[in-house]
Amino acid sequence: MQITDKKNKIVNLKWIAIGNLPIMTKRGHFILNGAARVIVNQILRSPGIYYQQKIYENYEEKWSQKPKDSYIRYYADLICMRGTWLRIEMDKEKNIWAQMKKLPKIPMFWFLLAMGFSEKKILSFDSGYLIGNLTTTPLEKKEIKKIGSKNSQLNDKTKNSNMKDKKKNKHNSNKTIIRKNSLEIDKNKKSLLSRYSYPYLKTPPEAWEHIAQLFFPQNTPGIAASFSKVPLPSGSAKKARASKNNVENNSKEKKNNFALIGRKWFYNRFMNPRAYDLGKQGRWSFNRKLSLNIKNTTLTGLDVLYATDYLIKVEKGVYKTDDIDHLKNRRVRTAGELISIQIGIGLVRLEKSIREKNFINNKAFNSAIREFFGTSPLSQFMDQINPLAELTHKRRLTSMGPGGVNRDNATLAIRGIHPSHYGRICPIETPEGKNTGLVNSMTTYARINDYGILESPYYKVYKGLVLKNTGIFFLSAEQEEKIKLAAADIFVSQISCLPKALIPVRISEDFTRIPRSQVQFIGISSIQMISIATSLIPFLEHDDANRALMGSNMQRQAVPLIRPERPIVGTGLEARAVSDSGHVLISKKSGFVTHVSANKIVIFSCSMD
């Protein structure tokens, strides 16, 4: 901790214990209050930008089978690691809006202005989509009515002055309000600016004011609100005119303050690194998708502007929508990342308590850690019925939990099997009931890389020759889309050559046959598509899929015997499953066993390491 004395300009550094963390054992679980607990891996949508479409159907009557008409709505979800999710959507009139949860939607033109762009920069893109939704009711008529109801003496004067200003300049009669009466929408025209005059365009401070008016309507400053606090003038017109000038001055100050409120809200929502963070994976996804080169992990104006332009091109058919269920768009949160997120929450609580009380107390930090390990749905009591149950529990992937899917609202698309699951997520082992498809298991050879992406191992193939000596290549689901993969059960000769006949391969999601010279990679094992529990089922290829699912789940419920025996029929993976679970003693060196007793096992080894 750094303690700074501003008067004497002295900086002192001291070590302070801020809390306690449980230590992970060598077997991969935690001991909390004497009980073993496992942090389950969580698989979520990866931070980034995703374009999707939704079809809306209008029925003439409730009992009619065919819809009267239908339309497609395109939208883009801007997903971050920490902060507010933003959605850029296009309605059926092809107007673009920015929307957040539990908040009114904002016209995209206002949103881009608030991000700091000029009118020329925004209108350099396809402006018909951006300014078409600026047709809202003008506010000045309502204000005139309110003023007239408050004061009858000023009613005629304010009406006449407003009418004169309208005739002089339709666009600039009230500069704090965008004038939309002069804008007419022609849906058949791609560009509105070529034929119709566009309204008076706002500067960023006024855009912040409009955004604040949307989110805080009860605090909206205006002439009517200011007039309600001023006593009604009784007497000559001079007093009335003087009071009106005071009201206008007060309203200008309030509008400036209100623009500042909108600006602060906008900064804290999207541009504050402590409140909004895309993460490395999210920033990489934005840069790759939108062809940008930005290092900042917060949301920038260029991100929103180019995302809007990309959405317009998706609607025109230039680009395709994204498959959100593809594993390239999902990542795994391991135990370390989940605990680090909770540590961040604990540090924020600790900072708040230090600022309020001016005293360091580690209760806030410890309570956050205790809350995660004790009450989080991702912290579970470890299944220790047999070694396989423990090993499977630690290799489990769940889509539920904080920030995940709700089991009651999960659709079949989320629960289903995707082609990108091959070699990464087992298609067989999943619970029965409400959690079907939401809780899965990693395959036998799958691994999680530093970015949380699931990878599967393959051998390189060069001109029909399998290069096993060059090592194993781990490929992600996105890398697999661009290469030609052969299955691992294809016959390979003793000199590692593929057969001369056409070889069945998978290219992205399509299956075809190609010559062996065009094959790029081949699987390393025929069991790399199934999990460890499923690989222990003998003759799995002759088993029904439903029975295999029940068998892989019921193996975890088997009670160990007092005198264990070898299985009559096995698959050869039993020893590896038991050794990896940590339930047996494993020698660190190879050698000959010379002595075995209840107290010790002696191994004679020639190695000197």
List the model feature ranges, each with a label:
Residues 1-398, 404, 443-562, 598:
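N-terminal non-catalytic structural scaffold regions of very large proteins
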Residues 31, 430, 588:
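Short, acidic, Ser/Thr-enriched surface-loop or helix-capping motifs
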Residues 367, 371, 437, 583-595:
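Generic structural motif
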Residues 399-427, 570-588:
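Flexible, glycine/threonine-enriched loop-and-boundary segments that flank and lead into catalytic domains
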Residues 558-569, 573:
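Edge strands and adjacent loops of beta-rich recognition modules
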Residues 589-607:
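Carboxylate/His-rich catalytic cores and anion/metal-binding grooves
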